[in-house]
Structures are given as C-alpha cells and as structure tokens.
C-alpha cells in the first residue's frame, strides 16, 4: 500500500435501524444479519439516544432522518424547527410577525384569500397540526377567508389516522367560524421528492383548478377511501369544496421540513419550471414556513439558524478530502442536512448520488439501490484519497415505512450483505468504520393491537466501532471502548478524535471514545440482530 495513501474514516448510517429487545414485530431481530451480529459481538459498541431532547425535539418526540443527520453533522443539540415554531405560537410572537402582518394587510386590501398547504399530521416530522391551528387562528382574527389544502400522512402516523385528524380540524374551523378544507391529497402525491413529477402534478392541479366539491366532510371522504383499501399516504388528490389558489391570493406551505416540500413549491413559484406544463399564477404571494431551498422565489417565515464549525466544515478547513454518498431518497440527508442546511459542498467535499428505484413503494424493491451505493463507495475508497466518507443505507427506513414485515426483513438482510463488502474495502485501506443509525423504525413493524406501524420510534440506535490498522485511536493503546449514555450529538466529536482533529467549541457533544482501562464494567446489551 502506498504510504501516502489515505486510510479513511467511514461513517455508515443505517437509516431507521433501531434497537429493541422485544421480538414481536421486530424485523431487525427477525432478519439474518451475520455481519452486524459478528461486529456487535467482537467490537466496541454502545446505544445512542436519537429522539426527543437528545436531538432538539420535545420530550418523547420520535426522531427522524432530517433531525438525525443534522445532529450528526453539527456535533451539538440543535433546537429543531418543530420547537421553534411551537414556541412562537405559544408565546404569541407568531401573531406579531411582520411578514404575516404585511401579507394579511395586503390580502384585506385586494380581497385575496389565504391558502394553507401542508401535512395535516400529529407526527411532528414534516409538520404539526398544531401549527396549522395557530395559522388558522391568525387568519380568523384578520378576517381573511382561509382554505386548507390538506396533505394526509400515514407514514409518520398510523395508516388510517387521517380521518380522525381531519374531523378534529373541521371542528376547529367551525369553532373559528372561518375557513374550509378545500382539497385532500396523500403525501405520496403532494410530497414526492424523487422527481416523479406526475405525482406532483396531480396535487398541484387539484389545488389550482376549481370545480365542484364532493359535498361530504373530509372525514367521510377519508372513510370512503379506506373502504377502497387506500390509506392516508395514498389518498388521491380530491376536491372537497371550491377554493382553488387564484391570482392575488397568498399561500403558506406550513411544512417545516424542506425535502418533501420542494417539488410542489417549485411548481407554484419557479418561472423556468419544467417538471410538467402549467401556467404560472400571477400576483401570488408564496410563503414557506422554513427555507426549503436557497434560491426559491418565496418569502420565508422562520429563517435558517446559522451553524458554524460543522463536521464537514472542520474537515474541509483541515485540508482533507471527504465524500458523501447515498441514493436519491437519502441524498439530501448526507449533504444538505448533514451540512446544517447548506446547499453547497465544502471545499474538498465530493458527492455521489445513486438513483433510487422508480417503484410505487419500496416493498416492491426492498434491495433499493444498496448494492450500487456499495459499489460506488468501494470504488471511491480504493482511490485512497478521502479522509472522511459519509454513507447512508436507506433500506431499513424506506421499506420499514411501507409496513411490509417480510420486505423489511429482506431490506435489512440486503444492507447486512452490503455492509460486509464495504467493511472489507475499508479494512483493506486500513481505515476505521463507525456504524450507527439516525433513528428507529424497522425494529417496530406493528403496534400492540397487531396493526401495521409505519412511523419512526423513540428507541435508541446501535453504534459500533471497527478500528482499522492505519486509523488506531490516539491515546487508547489499541484498546478502546465506547461509553454509554451517548447521543447523536456525540458522533461528530468522535469522528474528529479518530481523525486527529481538534473539536471546535461550538460542538458541545462529547466523544464516545474512552480507553479500555477507564471503562466501568457494565451489563452488555443484547445483540443487534438475531
């Protein structure tokens, strides 16, 4: 091996691979995962908290991929948008926001209407229904007609929870005496992020083309779709009442997570949009709850938080090269989210995007593109030029979301086989690998009543360190342990220690590494897999 070649430090993120002792509904324990099982038995390991306050969310709130990757890359607990927005509503500062005050004033002057587009869900991953309630209260106080274009969930919530949520929303609208639910659309259509423009087009057209309504309540329409075996995620775009977005109106997209809100927003606002043919609505005021993309011609209600000295930035400033690699479904997570919401790569940061399979749901292709991601990563590692490699395997999360137990087992087994190949390449390069997950999912596939569980969980996630010959941990004498009570915020400091780089003061996480002689003997957790 060339003495000048680089021995990489590789961060492998098993998206949605949570830890849970119980066997019932646990695809992780049901899957044959000999690689991970042997690693857990032979190498330093621990469990990390990946939900709630450990990642800047309310206590008891399940983690998610965006929050997980942001925390991993930041090396600190970052107050999440869910908390920022909820606090603004609770304190009343949202109702005094200058942007909202100006928009309400303009709508009153020109007789415009206020449209609220977003995921009507209690999941707290992309949005929260309480935020919509706050916005509807604002519109009612300003005496501006409100129209809700409800996107139904079924992924971060139970598959048939939408009827209950929308029935409560209709009661809230009646109590306010202002507003109607104009349209429904499952997130499968309205929140696609894989450039399946035919889905986005159906959602866009139901929101912008007027016509007669169904003459039924939202809950009644949902129950009718349930009878056709269509769950919340897959509700076809449907008009409940006249109320299309028109020139002179205002739209507020109240999702706070950007990745699944971008395509629909682009269709509304981009003059050079090419996803499908549509007229650009003139004189339309478009507001997004958070910044979805740096150059979108929209107004942003909650501006991005400025985070400095992120992991990628520290590695870049040290003059080291790094690589981010994932398939389409998780590409934004290892790039945009991992970099703290920064679109552009840092100097010396290369990126590889592998196309996800073009299927309706990923239980139809549980292998997804894991093999291709692994092939590309092995090729890159063989070049011996990257000091840090960040790789995401999407399968456990994306297939777990389908609720298909057998397909999720196949997804996990695929990842395990790919991990074996990847580790062989890292070992050959003398590198060190840190394997972990960003949140739970696949370890819980049905609830206590036997119904499919398609959401994330609050369970901890496994973390395994595979130390390489040319990346021995400084100061540990070749014998290192991972401490307990860690969180995702501790991962970036850990990687910096392995790389031999100083931890910046902005990173408040603590390295998970400790010499074996300083480790207090503790009960070992049970294995990751079978």
Curated annotation (Swiss-Prot):
The active site is at residue 65. This is 2,3-bisphosphoglycerate-independent phosphoglycerate mutase. Disulfide bonds: none annotated. One of its GO terms (biological process) is glycolytic process. Pathway: Carbohydrate degradation; glycolysis; pyruvate from D-glyceraldehyde 3-phosphate: step 3/5. InterPro entries: Alkaline_phosphatase_core_sf, BPG-indep_PGM_N, Metalloenzyme, PGAM_B_sf, Pgm_bpd_ind. GO terms for cellular component: cytosol. Substrate binds at residues 126, 155-156, 187, 193, 257-260, 330. It catalyses: (2R)-2-phosphoglycerate = (2R)-3-phosphoglycerate. Mn(2+) 2 binds at residues 15, 65, 438-439. Belongs to the BPG-independent phosphoglycerate mutase family. SUPFAM superfamilies: 2,3-Bisphosphoglycerate-independent phosphoglycerate mutase, substrate-binding domain, Alkaline phosphatase-like. Binds 2 manganese ions per subunit. Catalyzes the interconversion of 2-phosphoglycerate and 3-phosphoglycerate. Its EC number is 5.4.2.12.
